């Protein structure tokens, strides 16, 4: 069984027991329970439920594991014949969530 949930303006495919990495959820601390009620799609034992726009009564329950930063993404701006370049780096915050159950 799997579902597609919408959070932080993006859609993610989730399964029970798997870990979901999303944009940082500032309102939750590690160990808190998080509930996604914007379920767009559910597939269970060959049965398919598609929401218009969301599936009625469906929710996904997970537990926040950690807030951390992803690997550094480096960008380089090089100017030919000027002997100059600019290097920048960015590390995006993310939240790791363990999916505990999908309820209909």
Swiss-Prot record:
Superkingdom as given in the UniProt entry: Bacteria
Pfam families: Ribosomal_L21p
BP term (GO), one: translation
Annotated GO CC locations: cytoplasm; ribonucleoprotein complex; ribosome
PROSITE patterns to which the protein is assigned, alphabetical: RIBOSOMAL_L21
First and last residue of the signal peptide: none
Keywords: Ribonucleoprotein, Ribosomal protein, RNA-binding, rRNA-binding
InterPro entries documented for this protein: bL21-like (IPR028909), bL21-like_sf (IPR036164), Ribosomal_bL21 (IPR001787), Ribosomal_bL21_CS (IPR018258)
GO molecular function, one term: structural constituent of ribosome
PANTHER family: 50S RIBOSOMAL PROTEIN L21 (PTHR21349), LARGE RIBOSOMAL SUBUNIT PROTEIN BL21M (PTHR21349:SF0)
NCBIfam families for this protein: L21
Family membership noted in the UniProt record: Belongs to the bacterial ribosomal protein bL21 family.
Subunit structure as annotated in this protein's UniProt entry: Part of the 50S ribosomal subunit. Contacts protein L20.
Free-text function comment from the UniProt entry: This protein binds to 23S rRNA in the presence of protein L20.
Protein name, as recorded: Large ribosomal subunit protein bL21
Protein source organism: Thermotoga sp. (strain RQ2)
